[in-house]
């Protein structure tokens, strides 16, 4: 192989290798069961993707700043459990707080999003002003949030929280039927989140600031960017996205436990990297995040659909994450 051809091959591998791997996996899934591409399955994939897109948008903003968030999944779980206890139907015999009226959905959204924002602010404060790395900071908060959620879950009975008010069930499980295809309400919420983040990243000073911080924090500081304040804001905003995603996930599934959200952060990180959000910082697009989430959800759903052992699924997903990050590192090293 000539030096030129070898260089072209390596360039192609770095730029598109992960997509080749994912396409091969998809081809295997379809070969095993062609019914995988039914309209019902595609509807389910889109609905599952929608919640993950909201969560991944929160993670993506942090990766853009050279950060990450290992506590995302546990924040999703906390929001799900809190929302579930506040949105049970009054005629539910197992209602956690039987004397308390079912709260309005809008109020519960504000409550869980406020909780998410506070956790995000704590992460941001530790990272921006105590100079603790995002990995260690969010690893610690991941454990703390899970402990808080487990204590609350134990306090309210330590059993799956279900029996939601009909209004919330419609809010989270409703859909528009287009023949055999069902476009869920959750997908509309995800589209709103996508539009919001696209405008935030591309049309606001804040968006320019976070990309500047990710590209070169010192240069951003010299140019007048308040790095600490912007990190506080992006971590708080991420917490809001996790919380809203957790509330929707509880409604979509129809119940919540303290283990809901387990490993969601890894799926979100993997989807972001597959979608072109670089751990080197300062690189990423909203469309890339959406694409990465949909691709990863198709693989997850497909492996389950054809009956692949869940333990093998963990191995496959872990390998995809390592491969995607390795390719991202190679691309960054080449640019350096």
From Swiss-Prot:
Chain ranges sitting on the Periplasmic side read: 1-16, 74-106, 149-180, 248-256, 300-305
Where, per UniProt, does this protein localize?
Cell inner membrane
Give the membrane topology, semicolon-separated if more than one: Multi-pass membrane protein
Residues assigned to the Cytoplasmic compartment are 38-52, 202-226, 278, 327-336
Q: Which InterPro entries match?
A: ABC_transp_permease (IPR001851)
What GO cellular component is one of the record's annotations?
plasma membrane
> Keywords assigned by UniProt?
Cell inner membrane, Cell membrane, Membrane, Sugar transport, Transmembrane, Transmembrane helix, Transport
One Pfam family, please name it. BPD_transp_2
Q: Record's superkingdom?
A: Bacteria
Give the transmembrane region(s). Answer: 17-37, 53-73, 107-127, 128-148, 181-201, 227-247, 257-277, 279-299, 306-326
Write out the GO biological process terms.
DNA damage response; galactose transmembrane transport; methylgalactoside transport
Q: Does the keyword Transcription regulation apply?
A: no
Any one GO molecular function term: galactose transmembrane transporter activity
Role: Part of the ABC transporter complex MglABC involved in galactose/methyl galactoside import. Probably responsible for the translocation of the substrate across the membrane.
Subunit-structure text: The complex is composed of one ATP-binding protein (MglA), two transmembrane proteins (MglC) and a solute-binding protein (MglB).
Q: Which family does it belong to?
A: Belongs to the binding-protein-dependent transport system permease family. AraH/RbsC subfamily.
Q: Known NCBIfam families for this protein? A: PRK09478.1
Task: Supply the PANTHER family for this chain.
Answer: ABC TRANSPORTER PERMEASE PROTEIN YPHD-RELATED-RELATED, GALACTOSE_METHYL GALACTOSIDE IMPORT PERMEASE PROTEIN MGLC
Q: What is this protein called?
A: Galactose/methyl galactoside import permease protein MglC
Source species of the chain: Escherichia coli (strain K12)
């Amino acid at each position: 192989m000539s030096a030129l051809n070898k260089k072209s091959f390596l360039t192609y591998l770095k730029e598109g290798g992960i997509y080749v791997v994912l396409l091969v996996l998809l081809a295997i899934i379809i070969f095993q069961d062609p019914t995988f591409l039914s309209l019902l399955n595609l509807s389910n994939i889109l609905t599952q993707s929608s919640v993950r897109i909201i969560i991944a948008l929160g993670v993506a903003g942090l990766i853009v700043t050279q950060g990450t968030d290992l506590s995302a999944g546990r924040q999703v779980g906390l929001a799900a459990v809190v929302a579930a206890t506040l949105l049970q139907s009054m005629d539910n015999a197992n209602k956690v707080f039987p004397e308390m009226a079912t709260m309005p959905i809008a109020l519960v959204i504000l409550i869980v999003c406020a909780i998410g924002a506070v956790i995000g602010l704590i992460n941001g404060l530790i990272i921006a002003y105590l100079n603790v790395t995002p990995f260690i900071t969010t690893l610690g908060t991941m454990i703390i949030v899970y402990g808080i959620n487990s204590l609350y879950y134990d306090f309210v009975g330590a059993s799956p929280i279900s029996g939601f008010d009909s209004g919330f069930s419609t809010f989270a499980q409703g859909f528009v039927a287009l023949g055999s295809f069902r476009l869920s309400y959750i997908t509309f919420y995800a589209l709103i989140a996508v539009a919001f983040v696209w405008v935030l990243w591309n049309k606001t000073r804040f968006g320019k600031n976070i990309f500047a911080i990710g590209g070169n924090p010192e240069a951003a500081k010299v140019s007048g960017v308040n790095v600490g304040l912007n990190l506080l804001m992006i971590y708080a905003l991420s917490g809001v996205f996790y919380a809203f995603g957790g509330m929707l996930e509880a409604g979509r599934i129809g119940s919540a436990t303290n283990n809901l959200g387990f490993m969601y952060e890894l799926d979100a990180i993997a989807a972001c990297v597959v979608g072109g959000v670089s751990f080197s910082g300062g690189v990423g697009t909203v469309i890339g995040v959406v694409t990465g989430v949909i691709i990863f959800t198709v693989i997850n759903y497909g492996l389950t659909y054809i009956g692949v052992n869940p333990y093998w699924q963990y191995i496959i997903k872990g390998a995809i994450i390592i491969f995607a990050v390795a390719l991202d590192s190679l691309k960054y090293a080449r640019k350096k």
